[in-house]
Curated annotation (Swiss-Prot):
Name listed for the protein in its UniProt record: Bifunctional protein FolD
This enzyme's EC code(s): 1.5.1.5, 3.5.4.9
Entry keyword NADP: yes
Signal peptide: none
Keyword terms of this UniProt record: Amino-acid biosynthesis, Histidine biosynthesis, Hydrolase, Methionine biosynthesis, Multifunctional enzyme, NADP, One-carbon metabolism, Oxidoreductase, Purine biosynthesis
Catalytic activity entry: (6R)-5,10-methylene-5,6,7,8-tetrahydrofolate + NADP(+) = (6R)-5,10-methenyltetrahydrofolate + NADPH; (6R)-5,10-methenyltetrahydrofolate + H2O = (6R)-10-formyltetrahydrofolate + H(+)
Pfam families registered for this protein in UniProt: THF_DHG_CYH, THF_DHG_CYH_C
Residue positions binding NADP(+): 166-168, 195, 236
NCBIfam families: PRK14174.1, PRK14186.1
Involved pathway(s): One-carbon metabolism; tetrahydrofolate interconversion
Gene Ontology, cellular component aspect: cytosol
Matching PANTHER family: C-1-TETRAHYDROFOLATE SYNTHASE, CYTOPLASMIC, C-1-TETRAHYDROFOLATE SYNTHASE, CYTOPLASMIC-RELATED
Amino acid sequence: MLIIDGKKVSIDLKSELKVRVDEHRAATGKVPGLTVIIVGEDPASQVYVRNKAKSCKETGMHSSVIEMDASTSEEALLSRIRELNDDPDVHGILVQQPLPKQIDEFAVTLAIDPAKDVDGFHPENLGRLVMGHLDKCFVSCTPYGILELLGRYNIETKGKHCVVVGRSNIVGKPMANLMLQKLDATNCTVTICHSATKDIPSYTRQADILIAAIGKAGFITADMVKPGAVVIDVGINRIDDPSTKSGSRLAGDVDYEGVSAIASAMTPVPGGVGPMTIAMLLKNTLQSFERANNLQ
């Protein structure tokens, strides 16, 4: 079985991005800038933000973090976003989830300039994706990362049956729409399964490409997978494991041991889709910079 190594691809991609950033710095004296806003002190969010800042530094991009108190009002957050929208040195704006209850997440998404929405969550970017205008939008980072993996590993997709398990706005919906597009690493027949789908295994067993993004550890088992299928595991779940020092470990939505015995290719957890998400965030930020400076 082929292991689709997202960690390796993300390192390669960041090296390629650094070359482009260095070229732009030499030619213009400018570099892409990413600003992350974090509201509150969620420990997991703090880790994600640190990882993003580290990756920016590795590629030569400028990054900044705006920390706001958990009691911050929605209007105060929207005001900061408007300031960043008007800042020519900021090319990507990311508001780290989750947000406190007093803040409407959709209002925050709408407030971000679509040209700086490097998370790809703004309705304008999602609409352009659905319409097939990928050269004029930002694609949500996790689906975009999966597309990059399929392309770099030369996975045949044209005319294949892709089954996406999960319908979240972050992964499932944009992933399904992306796989419908007429691109080298897409152009599939697409089925979406979700919590209300009856007899999910009857669909997953038809998949040439199975993408699991349901948020349940080990949900996809070997008897649900077509022999020879390509399996992309988006899930990141922490489960108890007394054998580890911490007492827990990360597990995907797919039973790796069982499914790896029959799949032709598969992403591991960790080290599969996860590292690609941040890499594609940087790629989107660079693309925003290039569009803003007419460098494409």
